[in-house]
Each structure stands twice: as structure tokens, then as C-alpha cells.
Amino acid sequence: MTIVVGLDQHRAQITAEWVDTATGEIGRSRVRPADRAGLRRFLGRFRGQQLEVALEATTGWRFVVQELRTIGADVHLAEPAETAARRGRKKRPKTDRADARHLRELLLVDRLPESWIPPDHILDLRARVRLRHTLVDQRGEWQQRIHAVLYHHGCPHHHGIGLLTAKGRAWLDGLGLPSTALEQVTVALGMIDVLDVQLAPIDKQLRAYARRQPGCRALMAHYGIGHLTAVTILAELGDARRFSSSREAVRYAGLDITVKQSDKRRAPGHLSRQGPPALRWALYEAAQSGRRHSSPDRDYYLQAAERLGGNRACLAVARKLLKRSYHTLRELGDQALQPA
């Protein structure tokens, strides 16, 4: 006897609907509060029974999967966008109960679009990589604010001067900015210094991890991929065997070009940007090495740059690097994701 369950998870509550495949009996319940203790109480009724559970890969899924596996449940993590698409275009009521039922029905007829559930050490690595990516983004935003303030007050361009170096900061002090502008620049520099303090130990840990981990070492054999880009690619791409081809890995990363065509009309394509932003960042950073004289991709980059421009040429090299990374990790098999 198998019980098939659909869970719709939110911060305030988890809505559940299940069906006993032997009797056809349907049950419903809500878990409040939607925390670990509340979920354990709810799952107590299913202990000792064969359980298949579907839930979407939304915020909070990790602890739910852990608790479900504790009682021996077979867990299926649904990809949210594909799951919503399988509702069809016909308008239907959108409630938590309807969402739970939709997941349960898709799982029951084997049509659930599943996401990969990474092992715990990859989830932890992914969390650290994404934290670093967030801090780097914030650091860049504060730098952009400094540039905006300088331009707003008509300051000369800082040709060849790094604004965050000692020379650059001395140059900023000598501009004679108005008090409000000086305050903006001072606060921005202070925030950048704070972010640098937070980034330093994270970078150190990730670099050390990349030196020890087999998958990262294999990725770093490719020209342009360093310690931080390798560990980001590994964390975000995960088990490359889950993709049927390198093209599917490109789609997952959001580096594929969308196409809108009707009859003879074809709109210009753009990046789908559907995948993890940190993965696209790592690949784009690595791809910028393609313009170097020693790069094996230099000729390809120059040809693409002549037709498409430098930015799109870098994206083309990024796709090539992703395909190489996919094949490298796939060939390593289980060794690619070994804990460091």
C-alpha cells in the first residue's frame, strides 16, 4: 500500500493532500506552524507506511525533505515553473489546497517535472557560494553609487585610478566635494570595507575547498576557470549526469537564447536567465579570459566579437566553457561531487 502526498509549503502553513492508492481514500490537512516540530507531528500519522511525497523547490524545502526522509518517505522535488505550466492555460481556482492536489495528481500519474535534490554537503557549498555572490553584488552596487555621485557633481574621470586603492581614496579626498556628496562617498567606502572584511574568510574557505575537491581540480584544468569560478560551477551545476546533454545544461544555466517566431516574423533573441545567477556570473567571468593571446578560445572569441560585439562574444565563450565543464564532471561520475 502506497500513500501519495502533495505538499504546498508556505511560511505560515503547509497544506497537504494525500490519497491511499489501495482504497482511493483522500485525506487533507494543514500543518501550523510550518516548522520542523509541526511537520514531525503531522508525519507521525504516516510512520511505518510507504509514502511518496511531492513538493515544490521553493524556500524552505530542505528541512521538509530531511524530515520526510527520516520516516523513509520517497521524496520528489518539483520544478516550480514547469509544474505551474502543466496546469494548462485554462483558468482555474488558485488555492493552497488546489496546489497540493495538483502536485499529488502529477506524482500519481508520473508527470511531475522533478528537480535534483543535492546531497547536504553540496547544499552547504551552494549556500556559501550564493552568500559570496550576494556580497560581491552589494560591493559592486556601492562602487556604482560612488561613480554616480562623482558624475552628478561633474568630477573629472578617474583615468587609470582604482578608487578603492590608497591612491584612489586620496584622489577622492582632493576633489573638494560638497558635504552631502562627501558623506555619500564616505558611507559607500565604509560599506565596501565592511563587505571586504566579510568576503575575505569566505574566499579563503572556498579557495581551500577548490584545491582539495576532485571535481573543482578537474574544472580548473580548463583555461580561464580559477578556484572561485570552479567551486561556483560545481555547487550550482551539481551532478552533471542529471542533464541528458550539454545543451540542457546551457538551458539550466539560463545562457540559452530565447526565440519568438510566428510565420515569417522572428523577434531578436535574448538570454533566458532562468538559472542560478551565480553560475552565469562564474561562467562569464571565466569567459573573459577568452580574449587573451594565450587562450585556446581567442580565435573563436575574435570571430564572434567581430559579428556580435565583445559582450555577446564573452557569452558565446561562456557557453563553450559550460559544455566543457558538463563533460568533465559527467566523466568523473560520483567522484565529481565527493566531499573535500
Predicted regions and their residues:
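A detector of single, family-specific signature residues
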Residues: 1-340
